[in-house]
């Protein structure tokens, strides 16, 4: 029997997705009354770069993060082979993350600011970022980052509830999904760096590259630990620690890059 998602989860996921679709529509139709669209788009750009422009900036990338968070929470609500109370607690933690990121976007990174001047054309996206690889790199990378929110929420729920080991199987599945997305995102970024003049080849130990490598290494350790667990409490505690570490590094890396502290040619 397929589980139906809780109504609250469905509402949160629908709201976050609708907000992002509204922003994407503004980019597609070149609505320059939106200041974010004016800053990062142009009416003559190909459709793929209009769409990728939605996440080619700080505000849009935070909205993308929230949208992926809602999608993953929605899919997790269909998870079987896990206790109902444990799943509900995990979704409550996910809802709390939605609230935190939503408040951050509203008060510091609002992508829906109205342009104060009437314009007929936008400034356009940085030409260096108008690349097929870079068009899909951020969503895949963010899917890896945000996927660890599920693993994090499962681990926190495990600290509050004494359950059997079934949650470890679910955590392993989501950690593999997250690590795979993260690997793909890093690989696409490296591919772009390989042929982008002056970037330094496949891997240049650039700070932005290293930021994405940190959760990848922690995620690899988490996957191996989840495959080794056989009821040992010590390994379970290690798994909880790695789950928290992976998500913490993902959040830290995202905000560090998007804050402008690592001001490099990157998105």
Question: What is each of the regions a protein language model found here?
Answer:
Residues 17-18, 22-26, 66, 70-73, ...:
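Helical transmembrane-bundle signal
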Residues 3-4, 14-17, 47-68, 86-93, ...:
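Membrane-entry segments of alpha-helical transmembrane domains in multi-pass membrane proteins
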Residues 216-264:
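Polar, glycine-rich mid-to-C-terminal structural blocks
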Residues 3, 114-116, 146-169, 191-198:
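Conserved, charged catalytic cores of large soluble enzymes
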Residues 1-16, 20, 265-266:
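Single conserved hydrophobic/aromatic residue that forms the stacking wall/gate
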Residues 25-59, 110-138, 163-164, 188-211, ...:
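Membrane-interface interhelical loops and short amphipathic "cap" helices
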Residues 4, 14-17, 75-99, 159-180, ...:
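Membrane-interfacial loop-to-helix junctions in multi-pass inner-membrane proteins
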Residues 18-50, 61-108:
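Hydrophobic or amphipathic alpha-helical targeting/insertion segments
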């Amino acid at each position: 029997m397929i589980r139906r998602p809780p109504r609250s989860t469905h509402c949160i996921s629908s709201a976050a997705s609708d907000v992002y679709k509204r922003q994407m529509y503004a980019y597609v139709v070149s609505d320059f009354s939106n200041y974010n669209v004016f800053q990062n788009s142009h009416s003559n750009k190909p459709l793929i770069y209009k769409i990728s422009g939605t996440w080619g900036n700080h505000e849009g990338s935070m909205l993308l993060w929230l949208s992926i968070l809602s999608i993953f929470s929605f899919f997790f609500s269909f998870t079987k082979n896990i206790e109902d109370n444990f799943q509900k607690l995990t979704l409550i933690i996910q809802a709390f993350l939605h609230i935190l990121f939503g408040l951050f976007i509203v008060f510091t990174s609002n992508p829906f600011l109205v342009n104060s001047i009437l314009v007929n054309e936008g400034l356009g996206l940085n030409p260096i970022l108008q690349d097929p690889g870079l068009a899909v790199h951020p969503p895949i990378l963010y899917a890896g980052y945000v996927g660890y929110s599920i693993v994090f929420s499962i681990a926190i729920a495990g600290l509050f509830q004494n359950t059997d080991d079934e949650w470890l199987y679910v955590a392993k599945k989501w950690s593999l999904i997250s690590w795979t997305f993260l690997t793909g995102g890093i690989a696409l970024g490296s591919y772009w760096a390989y042929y982008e003049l002056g970037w330094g080849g496949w891997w240049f130990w650039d700070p932005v590259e290293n930021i994405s490598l940190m959760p990848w290494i922690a995620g690899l350790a988490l996957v191996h630990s989840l495959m080794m667990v056989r009821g040992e409490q010590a390994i379970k505690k290690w798994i909880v620690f790695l789950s928290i570490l992976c998500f913490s590094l993902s959040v830290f890396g995202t905000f560090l890059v998007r804050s402008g502290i690592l001001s490099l040619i990157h998105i």
